[in-house]
Amino acid sequence: MMRVRFPLLVLLGTVFLASVCVSLKVREDENNPFYLRSSNSFQTLFENQNGRIRLLQRFNKRSPQLENLRDYRIVQFQSKPNTILLPHHADADFLLFVLSGRAILTLVNNDDRDSYNLHPGDAQRIPAGTTYYLVNPHDHQNLKIIKLAIPVNKPGRYDDFFLSSTQAQQSYLQGFSHNILETSFHSEFEEINRVLLGEEEEQRQQEGVIVELSKEQIRQLSRRAKSSSRKTISSEDEPFNLRSRNPIYSNNFGKFFEITPEKNPQLRDLDIFLSSVDINEGALLLPHFNSKAIVILVINEGDANIELVGIKEQQQKQKQEEEPLEVQRYRAELSEDDVFVIPAAYPFVVNATSNLNFLAFGINAENNQRNFLAGEKDNVVRQIERQVQELAFPGSAQDVERLLKKQRESYFVDAQPQQKEEGSKGRKGPFPSILGALY
């Protein structure tokens, strides 16, 4: 009797959960194409005593497997207290997210401007070509922001256009000829240069694009700023807070906050979801996969082990018969500012080795479905009919049902008791512990 072939995604999950006897290849940190370590994957665009701006390397330069992310970049911004990132615009859409600290974000339009007080968890889309500036008004706390950039002119590349002329860069106004500037401003070039450019007075130029502010300047800027919307997540053009509503998944071991394109116009325009996840030390975000979204995971605080399961690409051979599927495990130890990419349909699991918080951008997010492979709720394996379970698994349907019911938690579980037990038996590495924690 011929056995029925089971859908590939469930096979992947089955292999991941039950260690089905197939060939398994493991790729660790540095050979992992989905892992971008903070220490060697970011390029510093600007840095002085007031802060820095860093740009993550292009995803498709890291690996051809990330080609579908060629149009996206990750930007990290940090600034000291009482500072401002000077006015500029870029040929890219930005989705800005506040990781820690406070900020005043001002968006400048042709005939108006809008200023907003931002707090941790606040997000805001900045459309391409919008002039904006960013203040850290706090007296003691640093500001930390992550931005997803989507360039509009060149795939994977964008430019910042600063109005100010500093020691770090020229004002884009300096690109125009003198007579054009004189006609445009109806003034002599000497006056334009003295007031706006300072080409011959370098000693008066700022040291860079992040500069200090006085207490009085901050007080004036703060007076004009509005608070972000914490009552609604559906704002079309104002900041919204990712963590202001109840988490979509929550128990004693973790919390999962998310806003999808269906709930927010700014995210709908970009086809992106935003997630912020807290996991307690020693706990596990259970194995699951996203149906169509590619997830860019950024570690904000803490450390974690992550395991991702895919199918190894088969080599072209002259033989006509099919090769057996070879499962490949990608594993990495993640820490603050590290980035990890999770392709659509690839099952993965996150084990927090300290209290953990990470942010996730979901690309191609509309109508994405999250499918858990273990746990009591939202478990795709539990929805498979008994007759099909008999064909798909070596155990009986009763055995499968009994196994799946052993895990009474959902979404997050405590892996520490299992890890201690495995440690006492002399086993090494996180994978056996992760498997044992599931059932």
From Swiss-Prot:
Glycans are attached at residue 351. Its main location: other. SUPFAM superfamilies: RmlC-like cupins (SSF51182). Residues 1-23 form the signal peptide. It is found in: Vacuole, Aleurone grain; Endoplasmic reticulum; Protein storage vacuole. The keyword Magnesium does not apply. GO terms for cellular component: aleurone grain; endoplasmic reticulum; protein storage vacuole. The N-linked glycans are not essential for the folding and assembly into trimers. Residues 430-439 are annotated as: Necessary for sorting to protein storage vacuole. Residues 411-439 are annotated as: Disordered. Disulfide bonds: none annotated. Pfam families: Cupin_1. Keywords: Allergen, Endoplasmic reticulum, Glycoprotein, Signal, Vacuole. The keyword Coiled coil does not apply. Residues 34-193, 240-401 form the Cupin type-1 domain. The alpha-, alpha'-, and beta-subunits associate in various combinations to form trimeric proteins. Seed storage protein. Accumulates during seed development and is hydrolyzed after germination to provide a carbon and nitrogen source for the developing seedling. Belongs to the 7S seed storage protein family. PANTHER family: OS03G0336100 PROTEIN-RELATED, VICILIN C72. This is Beta-conglycinin beta subunit 2. It comes from Glycine max (Soybean). The lineage of its organism: Eukaryota, Viridiplantae, Streptophyta, Embryophyta, Tracheophyta.
